[in-house]
């Protein structure tokens, strides 16, 4: 009865609690089907077509990470972005022997609208499954709908910069893959990237937590720019025709 009341209340404000088993099941099936991100990336790397990438929301570079293996094996020139200091430090350590990998300790923000993130506090992190380490978000409700208690959440100030400034900072002139996992902010980053740059990489981003009105706007932009796209699990895979991603 208590859970039903909570779900009704959150529903009134446009939020929906996400069942943990649902998320786990989605990830389990997506990693074991023939058409999954790992197989697509492996095929692309074997053809030597993935030589540079930008990952926004890299976390520690290991937890739920699709790119670590490929970056290291194929020596892919990479810029990895992670705003949370403790995960940034783990990320640096993870790639310390790979000089072709650059790491940025910032969040990517549109119009400087993000200066903090919500996360499970260190003293409460062990109360939850491993996945909560990867659900840090600019919206507190994102954590709550994943089952995190409000009094277990802390708000931390972070550095941020725009996608344009990031590209200038690392002199990114060619890009084969943009991979975004920012727990709800993905759509804005991808939209701003497409609108403000001439780069046309393969783009992979989570779309489950994007508001429907904005997602439709993003789909219109992808169509306008002639991107093709399809969904795998909670991710949308987008590619310009010249990339031949599925061949």
What annotation goes with each model-predicted range?
Residues 1-247:
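Phosphate/nucleotide-binding beta-alpha loop and adjacent structural elements of enzyme active sites
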């Amino acid at each position: 009865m208590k859970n039903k009341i909570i779900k009704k209340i959150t529903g009134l404000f446009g939020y929906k609690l996400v069942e943990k088993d649902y998320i786990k099941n989605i990830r389990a099936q997506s990693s074991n089907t023939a058409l999954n991100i790992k197989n697509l990336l492996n095929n692309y790397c074997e053809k030597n077509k993935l030589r540079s990438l930008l990952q926004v929301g890299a976390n520690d570079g290991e937890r739920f990470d699709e790119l670590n293996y490929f970056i290291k094996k194929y020596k892919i020139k990479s810029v990895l972005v992670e705003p949370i200091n403790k995960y940034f430090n783990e990320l640096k350590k993870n790639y310390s022997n790979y000089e072709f990998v650059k790491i940025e300790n910032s969040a990517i923000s549109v119009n400087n609208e993000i200066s903090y993130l919500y996360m499970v506090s260190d003293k409460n992190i062990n109360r939850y499954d491993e996945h909560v380490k990867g659900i840090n978000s600019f919206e507190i409700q994102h954590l709550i709908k994943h089952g995190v208690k409000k009094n277990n959440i802390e708000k931390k100030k972070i550095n941020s910069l725009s996608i344009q400034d990031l590209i200038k900072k690392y002199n990114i002139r060619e890009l084969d893959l943009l991979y975004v996992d920012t727990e709800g902010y993905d759509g804005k980053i991808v939209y701003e990237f497409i609108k403000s740059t001439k780069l046309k990489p393969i783009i992979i981003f989570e779309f489950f937590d994007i508001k429907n009105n904005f997602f439709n706007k993003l789909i219109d932009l992808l169509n306008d720019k002639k991107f093709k796209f399809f969904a795998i699990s909670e991710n949308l895979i987008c590619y310009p025709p010249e990339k031949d991603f599925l061949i």
